[in-house]
Amino acid sequence: EITKNKGRFLSVFFIVLLGAAFFSGIRSAEGDMKVSADRYYDEVNYMDLKVLGTLGLTDDDLADIAKTDGVKAVYGGKTVEVLHDIGESEQVVKLIALTDGVNEPRVVEGRMPEKEDEILVDTQFLKSSGCEIGDQVTFTSGTEDPLSDSLTGDTFTIVGSATLPYYMDLNRGTGSIGNGSINSFALLLPETFTSDLYTEIYVQADGAQEEASYSDAYDETVKAVQTKIEALEDAACDRRYTAVKTEGQEKIDDAKQQVADAEQ
């Protein structure tokens, strides 16, 4: 009967073959994507944890985390959110200090910054702003504080475009200025940032790189370190609050003294 209906048989055969191949591809795609992501994370030394502090993070915080059992390495990160005008609109850009050994960028075009007035921008920034490599960009503060409180300058020359491992899709996260959404990021040399405080601390857990990302073993390894770091929170917050309060009180006392001296 098959020989009498070769065309029909072959049609059914190839339909089944195509369906089986498609199903097998779908089933294996997730695993392949996870393996590729894990390899990429290892290549760029992606962080396992990120610590944030609303009042800023200090070298003491860095030292405490570094001494925590299960921590392989810690890195202090500096960032600042700024505004960039595009015609009649503006976009929020997160400026990030380049940090050796963690979250390494992949240069898509151009090169890495070599001077304080050079900048490596998000590929998305070039598309949205219409800027090109070699152009100069000027940023403004989105708060009452001048940009000079955070950076050595406000105008930079674009020397390249790049991607970052923790921005895997088009979403760049939420911000505290502008419309509340970050449109793109840009990378600067660490010495371009003037503050002694860190806005972020990146943590790599001991043994995490040997585990496959997204696996239960990886999650358990990182979770154990996270729990120990969270135990430092109360003491770190109290220490930072006291330091900020003391600094503020000293400024008030100095101002009062100046007023008293002027009245004499």
Indicate where each model-derived feature is located:
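N-terminal Sec/SRP start-transfer signal
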Residues: 1-24
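Basic-flanked hydrophobic alpha-helices used for secretion and membrane insertion
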Residues: 31-264
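Alpha-helical transmembrane segments
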Residues: 19-26, 30, 241
